[in-house]
Amino acid sequence: MNRRIAIDNYDQIILNIPAEVFYQQFSDSAPYLQIHTDENIFDALNARVENNQLILETKENSNIRPSKLTIYTCSHNISQATVSGSGKLRLKGEVNAGDFKSEILGSGDIQADSLICNTITTKITGSGNEQLVGASNHSSFAIVGSGSIHAFNYLVRESNCKIIGSGNIEALVTDRLDINVIGSGNVSYRGNPPAVNKEIAGAGKVQAVQ
């Protein structure tokens, strides 16, 4: 079953349900939500915009197990995205943001087709996964746990990569790379940056990849 809902504009997404969300940036289109799910799931959903945040969650005391839950949405801009649990967020097409911040709590997934911004800050706590394509001047990647950040196709000038645990980061850096690993995490990088600073405590590894 499908429902399309008109909503206010927003620049942040908070995903707290096991949904697959497809976001597009349209500066000249009215924001909307289009929800595809089982008919009995709609009444348990609480989808709203508050304080420029699109919040996607369930109503109090609701526990959903949909056979499918797919959400399509757009806004004029996006600056922040948070995924809690096992949700998936895809930024479709080209997305331009001044500064972009993303966070995954749990086993969720974020994928960006073409994200262009000045700075990007990404943090994963748990076993989540983030895959990035695009470019930025500066990136800050952090993992606590066993998560992964795949950014071999995300070009940055300067990057700060930190892992606590067994996570994995792949980065494409041209100028400066600062790495801090505590545990058995791995950082692989491309781009031949002339300045690479490493601090490793444990069995972590740093590898330059051609």
Task: Give the residues covered by each predicted segment.
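Intrinsically disordered, low-complexity terminal regions
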Residues: 1-210
